[in-house]
């Protein structure tokens, strides 16, 4: 854990039509955050989704009211707009974000957390080589 005092943590996901992945992604993020700090929140920015992403997120807010919330955009504002809303909504010391399509495991935040130290202000992670499942490769073409 960084420093001597636990930091607080915001995890957020911009999401657009991610009904197939967003529920499990949020639950995984909640589980991971709880192992790192008692002071955490998970936020999803629903960027005008036309599928049932919004309904799934509303149900998750009922199930996890203490640590989960959603920001709904009535119309799609694009990736940059969703990121801006996510950063605006985040209230904790540290902020972690990744996309709502579950391409990345929110559990990776634990590796970033380990890299923090009193003299480190910013940590960034990325995949050096991707190992996408077949459906991700097909969708990406």
Regions found by a protein language model. Name each.
Residues 33-38, 61-67:
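Short helix-capping segments at alpha-helix termini
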Residues 27, 55-58, 84-85, 110:
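Active-site phosphate/pyrophosphate- and oxyanion-stabilizing loops and adjacent acidic/basic residues
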Residues 10, 41, 67-69, 121:
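Structural signature of beta-strand start/N-cap positions in the alpha/beta core
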Residues 1-31:
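N-proximal low-complexity "stem/linker" segments adjacent to membrane-targeting elements
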Residues 20-24, 51-60:
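Acidic helix N-cap motif at the loop->helix transition within catalytic regions
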Residues 71-89, 94-97, 103-141:
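Acceptor/aglycone-binding surface of glycosyltransferases and processive sugar-polymer synthases
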Residues 46-55, 102:
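A conserved acidic beta->alpha catalytic loop
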Residues 38-48, 69-73:
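Short beta-strand/loop segment that forms part of the nucleotide-sugar
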């Amino acid at each position: 854990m960084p420093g001597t005092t636990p930091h607080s943590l915001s995890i957020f996901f911009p999401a657009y039509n991610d009904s197939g992945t967003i529920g499990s992604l949020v639950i995984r993020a909640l589980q991971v955050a709880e192992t790192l700090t008692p002071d955490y929140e998970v936020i999803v920015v629903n960027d005008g989704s036309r599928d049932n992403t919004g309904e799934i997120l509303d149900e998750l807010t009922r199930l996890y009211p203490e640590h989960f919330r959603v920001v709904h955009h009535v119309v799609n504002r694009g990736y940059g707009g969703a990121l801006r809303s996510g950063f605006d909504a985040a209230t904790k010391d540290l902020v972690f974000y990744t996309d709502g399509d579950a391409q990345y495991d929110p559990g990776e935040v634990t590796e970033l957390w380990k890299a923090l130290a009193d003299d480190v202000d910013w940590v960034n992670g990325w995949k050096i080589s991707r190992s996408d499942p077949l459906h991700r490769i097909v969708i990406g073409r």
